Amino acid sequence: MYSTKYRRGFLANQGRGYPRHSTGKRSRNVSRIDFKRRSSKYVHGNDDSKMANQRIHENQFGPEFVMVHNTAISTFITFPSLGKTEPSRSRSYIKLKRLRFKGTVKIERVHVDLSMDGPSPKIEGVFSLVVVVDRQPHLSPTGCLHTFDELFGARIHSHGNLAVSSALKDRFYIRHVFKRVISVEKDSTMIDLEGMTSFTNRRFNCWSAFKDFDRQACNGVYGNISKNAILVYYCWMSDIVSKASTFVSFDLDYVG
């Protein structure tokens, strides 16, 4: 379990962000660290020939990834640790190739007044999953990631085209948006999630770098990334008292 300052799954509600307890399950491959101390500065030269194409898998689910209506969650993709057991990395940098995700979101009505007469109204709302690149990763003074509202202006903006707030455009950019408009008469429904985005192409290479100052902490958590972290934002907007529970698998292809 990571320390509090690297905790993920922050819930945005009524314009504020609150750190949630780290009880959510995040299944991923963990590599043992075995290395010589390296400088955090990197130069991509002939030494890169020792780097290999790899893939790291991560599941995001559990209590941390359950949202009540009109709330959002901010989290990050875990990068590989420095080590020899794949998936891992051999340098203080990796080349990001592509990110694939696949999973489900379950939308459920929350019954708050059992004495209501007549049929229940439809569950209507908008679910969004947004992949964002953070060019200069660093935690805020509160130890939290930027909330959905801070990054995009307001959660209601998920009904239209999302855009990064002008004050943060130099640091963040949107890489992929998955959005579903939901309208069902049932008390619950399941929606499939699937998508892919590329970071490197024939014209452009996207590199992520790591601090790796402490030999006991050469891992892939947000707090150890110094360049190009990948953030994920979930948002469920609805006028109906309800909740959204997500289970999403991420596969990150990289050269490391």
Curated annotation (Swiss-Prot):
Binds to single-stranded and double-stranded viral DNA. Interacts with the host nuclear shuttle interacting (NSI) protein. This interaction may allow NSP to recruit NSI monomers to the viral genome and thus regulate nuclear export of viral genome by NSP. GO terms for biological process: DNA transport; transport of virus in host, cell to cell. This is Nuclear shuttle protein. It is found in: Host nucleus; Host cytoplasm; Host cell membrane. GO terms for molecular function: single-stranded DNA binding; structural molecule activity. It is a peripheral membrane protein. Binds to the genomic viral ssDNA, shuttles it into and out of the cell nucleus. Begomoviruses use 2 proteins to transport their DNA from cell to cell. The nuclear shuttle protein (NSP) shuttles it between nucleus and cytoplasm and the movement protein (MP) probably transports the DNA-NSP complex to the cell periphery and facilitates movement across the cell wall. One of its GO terms (cellular component) is host cell.
